[in-house]
Regions:
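Short, basic, low-complexity termini and linkers enriched in Ser/Thr/Gly/Pro
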Residues: 182-192
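A polyanion-binding, active-site-adjacent surface
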Residues: 1-128, 133-183
Length: 194
């Protein structure tokens, strides 16, 4: 793992997003999802009421691993090893115990596997609301695919439809709605019903 440690803003929130690990650009930027995958992801969340700035100030952003894992031999970012995941898990577990979130949004297969280790395919969990339990906490889980430009899953079927379904579920969730309630101009309930 290559420092620095990258974390989101220390915001108390009923919603917790869990990513995989920072990319090479996130360390210098000092924040998670600071590059192209983030632009895609924040576009998704803007469609259900929170732009990037609002999201970063209202949603707690965690990660399975806190440092850039380095590049993979074949290109792209290396997926953290099981030992690296285990070494970092205490941080995410502590965050869950402090926040006690009502909604957890794991982004990408590694984050999803922390809650559902037997899930093999994204289509098994994207577009569904499930109950999750980790670190002695119980919460709703609505998973999203990783927004990486290298992945076509969220741009082709069935991923495109399942992503839209997942985002609608997030937008309708009471924990998400509570984030919008602090600013009535952010309420998208009419557009979600349309």
């Amino acid at each position: 793992m290559i420092g620095p440690v990258v974390t989101g803003n220390p915001v108390m929130s009923p919603v917790m997003l869990i990513g995989q690990a920072p990319g090479v650009k996130e360390g210098p930027a000092g924040k998670p999802f600071a590059w192209t995958a983030g632009k895609t992801m924040f576009g998704w969340f803007a469609g259900i009421g929170l732009d990037e700035e609002q999201f970063r100030s209202r949603v707690y952003m965690a990660a399975v691993c806190r440092c850039f894992p380095g590049k993979a031999a074949g290109g792209g970012d290396r997926v953290p090893s099981p030992d690296e995941v285990k070494a970092c898990s205490k941080h995410m577990h502590a965050e869950l115990q402090i926040l006690k979130p009502r909604l957890v949004i794991p982004v990408g297969k590694l984050a999803i596997s922390q809650l559902y280790p037997t899930v093999d395919k994204l289509a098994e969990v994207i577009g569904e609301k499930r109950r999750g339990e980790l670190a002695g906490q119980s919460f709703d889980v609505i998973a999203l695919p990783h927004p990486s430009g290298a992945s076509t899953w969220h741009r082709t079927e069935p991923g495109k439809t399942l992503l839209a379904r997942a985002l609608a579920m997030i937008g309708a969730h009471d924990a998400w709605r509570s984030l919008l309630a602090s600013d009535p101009s952010l309420d998208t309930s009419d557009s979600l019903r349309a």
